[in-house]
């Protein structure tokens, strides 16, 4: 194998199999583009993004790791979200949860 070389199997790779998903329309009401990364807790995205925020608690974009979705000013777009896996704790982002998703504080 050459350093940095990929050895990828033939066939389909299934991501987030058997995970709860949610599809919703998101509008950028701001005057600047907003980019959201693959593992960003969608509930805590920029307030200029308009959508049913409470429904997205515990979800992230259902896209490949390391990628992002860009929302242009005035743009409406449909996205699919996937439930966050693991121990369901969220730290950082905009600081709105800072712990367990079930019992986290929300203002």
Swiss-Prot record:
One of its GO terms (biological process) is urea catabolic process. It catalyses: urea + 2 H2O + H(+) = hydrogencarbonate + 2 NH4(+). Pathway: Nitrogen metabolism; urea degradation; CO(2) and NH(3) from urea (urease route): step 1/1. Keywords: Cytoplasm, Hydrolase. It is found in: Cytoplasm. GO terms for cellular component: urease complex. One of its GO terms (molecular function) is urease activity. Heterotrimer of UreA (gamma), UreB (beta) and UreC (alpha) subunits. Three heterotrimers associate to form the active enzyme. This is Urease subunit beta. It comes from Teredinibacter turnerae (strain ATCC 39867 / T7901). The gene is ureB.
């Amino acid at each position: 194998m050459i350093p940095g070389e990929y050895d990828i199997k033939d066939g389909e790779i299934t991501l987030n199999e058997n995970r709860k998903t949610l599809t919703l329309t998101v509008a950028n009401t701001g005057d600047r583009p907003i980019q959201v990364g693959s593992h960003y807790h969608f509930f805590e995205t920029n307030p200029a993004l308009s959508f049913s925020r409470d429904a997205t608690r515990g979800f992230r974009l259902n896209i490949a790791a390391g990628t992002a979705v860009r929302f242009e000013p005035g743009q409406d777009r449909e996205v699919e979200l996937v439930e966050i896996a693991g121990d369901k704790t969220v730290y950082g982002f905009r600081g709105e949860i800072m712990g367990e998703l079930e019992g986290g504080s929300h203002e």
